[in-house]
Swiss-Prot record:
Na(+) binds at E263. Residues 259-260, 319-482 are cytoplasmic. The lineage of its organism: Eukaryota, Metazoa, Chordata, Craniata, Vertebrata. The chain crosses the membrane at residues 243-258, 261-277, 300-318, 483-501. Belongs to the ligand-gated ion channel (TC 1.A.9) family. Acetylcholine receptor (TC 1.A.9.1) subfamily. Alpha-3/CHRNA3 sub-subfamily. This is Neuronal acetylcholine receptor subunit alpha-3. Keywords: Cell membrane, Disulfide bond, Endoplasmic reticulum, Glycoprotein, Golgi apparatus, Ion channel, Ion transport, Ligand-gated ion channel, Membrane, Metal-binding, Receptor, Signal, Sodium, Synapse, Transmembrane, Transmembrane helix, Transport. It is a multi-pass membrane protein. Pfam families: Neur_chan_LBD, Neur_chan_memb. Glycans are attached at N47, N164.
């Protein structure tokens, strides 16, 4: 570095140091002059009857918390106060051109503006921040403060709720004749607002009021800011509403599960237990208040009733499903309603037994073993045809007897054997009680054959009774299936309409 550069650098440093010293001395002289005889307890007015005009503005930095249980809104605010103090004026030319000076706020007179609806903490802001003083006496004081204001909340539509929280600022001791508040702007300053993850500020207008209280004759001005906030429902939708919807649809699946699997009640109890555990987990999330029932609370109660009714109905369906002819007799109206009318309405088609569809003109066994949905007129027709066929069998075996008696010569056993062998196909095809009785009555057979025929008759009667019992059991099972299908659609409609009805209420209330 050459000598010229060194001289230039030294000259600049000297000028800066000298100017700083002069500025410090000028500011010190100004401070001593301003506060030599200043009294911070006296209102800064030349005429005692004149009010001090205080311009007031609120800037919100952060919406810290909204406590629904205690009904408190916690905010971080910057309060801008602007007023003029005639005793704090100076000429900048006399003090090295100083136009602004920062002074401790406890050294000057300050308006005692407090938050009227403060819930917790101090009503006054702290005086640790400095005030900006201008040469013409204008004072700007912007103290930051964290307020916990009381806010009556309506959580009826939680978590889709809107809240209106007000903050009322005003002088606590000075009436309008002493301090006149002027609102800066028409709403809260949101330029430095940090977005909250739970709440959104829709609007925050400000209003000035002049109120006469019962305690005093004077009129007191105040500035009230109304914070219109909306809860962001994404967190509650994912953690509350969607699990409840899934549990509700699991309840619907109970009615689609077949009764024979034996897991219907198990599924119902599992859904109820899962809902109970879920309610225990989210108890701290839901606002615990007895003033109103929140929307999510109504939906959880709706889901609980939903699951409980599904258990009751499932027990009833299982009771119907496992009924037998030995314990219950099916009334005719049940057969008409649940076996004929309702299946058509519910678009249910009962499969027809193959034996019935393949041999409609067969014997009584085939007719009685069919599992078709309608057993009224068709069953009667089958029974009448079976009785006619029994009479035909009697006639046929009667002719066989006459033929046997018409035989002459030889052992009587041979004609009997031939007659039996000749009619064997008919007996095997139409094994009815009439046919068996005809064989036993009009045939001269050995005791062994009679015993065999009686055994066949017993087996046929047993098979017939079992088939009839099986038919009745199948009818009861089909009735249970119809009831299941009815409640399946009923629960689907109730679940969809109930969900839409509950969660459309906030939207309807907002537009109304």
């Amino acid at each position: 570095m050459n000598s010229a550069s060194r001289i230039t650098l030294f000259f600049l440093l000297t000028v800066l140091i000298t100017q700083e010293c002069l500025s410090s001395k000028g500011e010190d002289r100004l401070f001593r002059r301003l506060f030599r005889r200043y009294n911070q307890f006296i209102r800064p007015v030349e005429n005692v009857s004149d009010p001090v005009t205080v311009e007031f503005e609120v800037s919100i930095s952060q919406l810290v918390k909204v406590d629904e249980v205690n009904q408190i809104m916690e905010t971080n605010l910057w309060l801008r106060h602007i007023w003029n103090d005639y005793k704090l004026k100076w000429l900048p030319a006399e003090f090295d051109g100083i136009e602004f000076i920062r002074v401790p706020s406890n050294k000057i007179w300050r308006p005692d503006i407090v938050l009227y609806n403060n819930a917790v903490g101090d009503f006054l802001v702290e005086d640790k921040t400095k005030a900006l003083l201008k040469y013409d006496g204008t004072i700007t004081w912007v103290p930051p403060a964290i307020f916990k204001s009381s806010c009556p909340m309506d959580i009826t539509y939680f978590p889709f709720d809107y809240q209106n929280c007000s903050m009322k600022f005003g002088s606590w001791t000075y009436d309008k004749a002493k301090i006149d508040l002027v609102l800066i702007g028409s709403k809260v300053n949101l330029k430095d607002f940090w977005e909250s993850g739970e709440w959104e500020i829709i609007d925050a207008p400000g209003y000035k009021h002049d109120i006469k209280y019962n305690c005093c004759e004077e009129i007191y001005p105040d500035i009230t800011y109304s914070f219109y906030i909306r809860r962001l429902p994404l967190f509650y939708t994912i953690n509350l509403i969607i699990p409840c919807l899934l549990i509700s649809f699991l309840t619907i699946l109970v009615f689609y599960l077949p009764s024979d699997c034996g897991e219907k009640v198990t599924l119902c109890i599992s859904v109820l237990l899962s809902l109970t555990v879920f309610l225990l987990v989210i108890t701290e999330t839901i606002p615990s208040t007895s003033l109103v029932i929140p929307l999510i609370g109504e939906y959880l109660l709706f889901t609980m009733i939903f699951v409980t009714l599904s258990i009751v109905i499932t027990v009833f369906v299982l009771n119907v499903h496992y009924r037998t002819p030995m314990t219950h007799t099916m009334p005719s109206w049940v057969r008409t309603v649940f076996l004929r009318a309702l299946p058509r309405v519910m678009l249910m088609r009962r499969p027809i037994d193959l034996s019935e569809s393949s041999g409609k003109g067969g014997g009584e066994i085939a007719g009685s073993s069919g599992t078709g949905g309608g057993r009224g007129a068709e069953g009667k027709k089958m029974k009448s045809s079976a009785s006619q066929q029994g009479a035909m069998n009697s006639l046929e075996f009667g002719e066989g007897k006459a033929a046997l008696e018409g035989k002459k010569g030889g052992c009587p056993c041979h004609p009997i054997k031939e007659a039996i062998e000749g009619d064997c196909g008919k007996v095997s095809r139409q094994l009815t009680p009439q046919a068996i009785n005809t064989v036993v009555t009009f045939s001269v057979v050995s005791p062994e054959i009679k015993q065999a025929i009686e055994s066949v008759k017993y087996i046929a009667e047993n098979m017939r009774s079992r088939n009839k019992a099986k038919e009745v059991e199948d009818d009861w099972k089909y009735v249970a299936m119809v009831i299941d299908r009815i409640f399946l659609w009923v629960f689907v409609l109730v679940c969809v309409l109930g969900t839409l009805g509950l969660f459309l209420q906030p939207l309807i209330g907002f537009f109304s």
